[in-house]
Amino acid sequence: MSIQKIDYEFIHPELNYEAEPNFQPAIKVSVYFKKREGITSETFFHHWQTVHADLAVATEAFQHHILRYAQHHQTPEMKERARSLGEGVLDYDGCAQLWVRTWDDWMAFYSSKEYAAALSDDCNFFMQLPMTYMIGYENLIVGDASTAIGGKDGFRTQGQ
């Protein structure tokens, strides 16, 4: 593979052209969605962080295949702050972030009849379908890794 390089003197040697990426040992699945019309943002976020999270975590498919689950709540206030930057803003209200060890783990979870039975009606209650996916690897630059999955920390900056 040929990479086009520019003439650049790196401030952080951890990031130079020869440095290996710090990919975490998991696949990160980000699932973007909007709240269903007819419900308030408060209902959407509260339902998602309580009922929906509980239903998801309670499934055996989740217990056997999901390493990490986080919710990214983009509230109306945060959406307005993002718009004030004058840049584009993703038109979603939430992003569920799930980590799995392998693609087979994701497919076992995603295609589980138990998961579908537990969450299908609930999804219809509070979110618009279809959902939008982004799937890849996390390259941790700065910050702490999840030690539970054997991740490697990023490097430290002066402010840390």
What are these regions (language model features)?
Residues 1-160:
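Macromolecular interaction modules
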